[in-house]
Curated annotation (Swiss-Prot):
Name of one Pfam family that matches: GidB
Family of the protein in this entry: Belongs to the methyltransferase superfamily. RNA methyltransferase RsmG family.
Origin species: Burkholderia pseudomallei (strain 668)
Catalytic reaction equation(s): guanosine(527) in 16S rRNA + S-adenosyl-L-methionine = N(7)-methylguanosine(527) in 16S rRNA + S-adenosyl-L-homocysteine
Subcellular location: Cytoplasm
Protein's name according to its UniProt entry: Ribosomal RNA small subunit methyltransferase G
Molecular-function annotations in GO: rRNA (guanine-N7-)-methyltransferase activity
Coiled-coil ranges per UniProt: none
Primary enzyme class: transferase
Amino acid sequence: MTVQQRRRLPIASRETLQALLSEGAQALGVALSDAQRGALLDYVALLAKWNAVYNLTAIRDPRQMLIQHILDSLSIVPHLGAHGAAAAALDVGSGGGLPGVVLAIALPGWRVTLNDIVHKKSAFQNQAKAELKLGNLSVVTGRVETLRSGADVPAKFDVIVSRAFADLADFVTLARHLVAPGGSIWAMKGVRPDEEIGRLPDGACVKQMIRLTVPSLDAERHLIEVELDEAI
């Protein structure tokens, strides 16, 4: 059995997921090629296959993985597009590669770096990079506050994003030194994080808060863009 065969979901399941992905992406306004859709489904298959080994997600069902991980991550793509077709992004606390792997697939002109402190999760991220042939994806292990541009990472980032990393104020404090001029920090949240916003550090303010609608997901989702004085 080839690597390609091992990572594929059963045909019926894959067809069902493909329809769900196509409908969801269309509803979100995200254009995906056949190759991109295939890569996203291969990624779901990798998550499902290796979850028990790497402890990547509490979700076990591939359909729910597609909804709660893939479509949820795709929902931010139209909003991050304001940074252009060739931006550099850092995904902090990436875990199984979310949303960074999805961004690397959906935005092939972007350079995406995944960051986590857990080595086995970085190992899975590197495996996903290799199996999905994502040349625009990099992996760096370590605490984000210790990373230095020009050393641990090549340069500062236009976009720093997190899906489930920390309190918003802590996220901004720990990652702000890696934001490039003109860049910003984006936090994916569930319910509106008003208390967290109230604790933002000096020199940081909310530029916009977007209520997201994720297809097939009955849950609140918000995307918060934080602007920094030093990055303006």
